[in-house]
Amino acid sequence: DAEHSPNTPLSVFVETYKKVIGEIKKLGKIPVILNLPPVDARKYFRWVSNGVNGDNIMKWLGGDEIYIYRWHEMYNAAICDLSNSMKIPMIDIRSAFLVKRDYSDYLCEDGIHPNERGHKLIKDTLVDAIKAVLPGRTAADVNG
């Protein structure tokens, strides 16, 4: 019944992001941020409840494992808000996952970290974004 908090509370996540952005700007560079890949709440629930009482975790989640997705979405929304409020360019990698028929195929067994296919999807999305802002570049130039 105890309240459980994430390892990194949202406020700490946002402040850390702001500090990193500030440090990049101090170096005279232009920061570019990425939004988050989606989480597969069911896989993540299975992963975190492995070897512990999943019923207790489910009770804390209010009986809804999709709560994990919504919680994760708050962190993604915070990144989008930072991009808007600080006028920082953001590359949308999340949509690259979400348009896939089953984006879970691009995540590790833990349901939260990209697997090899997921990392390739992120790389391809980044290459496309870079080519869009650096016209005339080839994939070889960008992949360097």
Where in the sequence are the language-model features?
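Alpha-helical cap/lid subdomain in secreted, periplasmic
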Residues: 1-144
